[in-house]
Structure formats: structure tokens, C-alpha cells
């Protein structure tokens, strides 16, 4: 597939302060996917789960046919930063997480994603 979205990808970054990997799990995954022909890859470095992750990736994939991957991602993050947050729909958010507000503007929800794109689709559109 030309576009791959892996919102549940597990990496060592998920363990936070525990001693983790050196990033090879991400690098080798990206190399394998790109060598198989993928042009756009979105993967998570830690799992957030929940409704916000679903909405974020849904918005990204809906916008991807209409704009470059970076613009589609920026738009989806902006929408989620202003979207209402329902803690009951977020399995990794507990009652003790008081610094989270009423919206999903905390970086926990969107900063853990890594977008890799060849830019080929955007270049082809500009040449026409």
C-alpha cells in the first residue's frame, strides 16, 4: 500500500522513563515499509488508544487524498487540539490526570506520532 497508518505501533518510547531501545524498531520498520513501496507512513511511538487517536487518524486519512501529508497531519492535529475530550473514552487517561483540560490539546494525544512521506505525490501535482 502507498499509505500506511499504524496508530497502535509499540516502541520503547512507550515505557517512558524505563530503559528502552535505541530507535532501531522505528528505523527498521520505516525502511521495510518504504522499500516495499509505501510513500506515506504514520506510526505512533507510544499508544494512546481511545477516541482521540481514532479521530486523529481518521481526519488524517480523509484529508490525505486532497493535500500533502504534512498539511493533512497539521490539519488533523489542529482539529484535535480544539476537540472536546471525554476521559471515559481515553483508556490511558485516569482521574488523577488533572493537567489535562477539557480538550485534547495536551501533546500526549498527538506528539507521539511520526509522519514519514516521500513527497512524490506533492511533486507530481506541482508539475502538471
How should these model regions be labeled?
Residues 1-59, 65:
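Catalytic cores of nucleophile-dependent amide-cleaving enzymes
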Residues 53-128:
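An often Trp-containing, charged/polar helix-loop segment at the C-terminal end
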Amino acid at each position: 500500500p502507498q499509505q500506511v497508518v499504524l496508530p497502535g505501533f509499540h516502541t520503547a518510547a512507550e515505557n517512558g522513563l524505563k530503559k528502552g531501545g535505541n530507535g532501531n524498531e522505528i528505523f527498521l520498520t520505516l525502511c521495510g515499509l518504504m522499500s516495499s513501496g509505501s510513500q506515506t507512513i504514520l506510526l505512533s511511538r507510544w499508544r494512546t488508544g481511545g477516541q482521540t487517536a481514532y479521530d486523529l487518524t481518521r481526519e488524517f486519512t480523509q484529508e490525505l487524498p486532497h493535500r500533502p501529508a504534512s498539511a493533512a497531519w497539521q490539519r488533523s492535529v489542529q482539529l484535535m487540539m480544539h476537540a472536546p475530550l471525554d476521559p471515559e473514552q481515553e483508556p490511558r487517561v485516569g482521574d488523577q490526570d488533572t493537567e489535562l483540560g477539557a480538550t485534547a490539546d495536551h501533546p500526549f494525544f498527538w506528539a507521539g506520532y511520526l509522519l514519514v512521506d516521500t513527497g512524490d505525490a506533492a511533486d507530481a501535482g506541482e508539475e502538471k
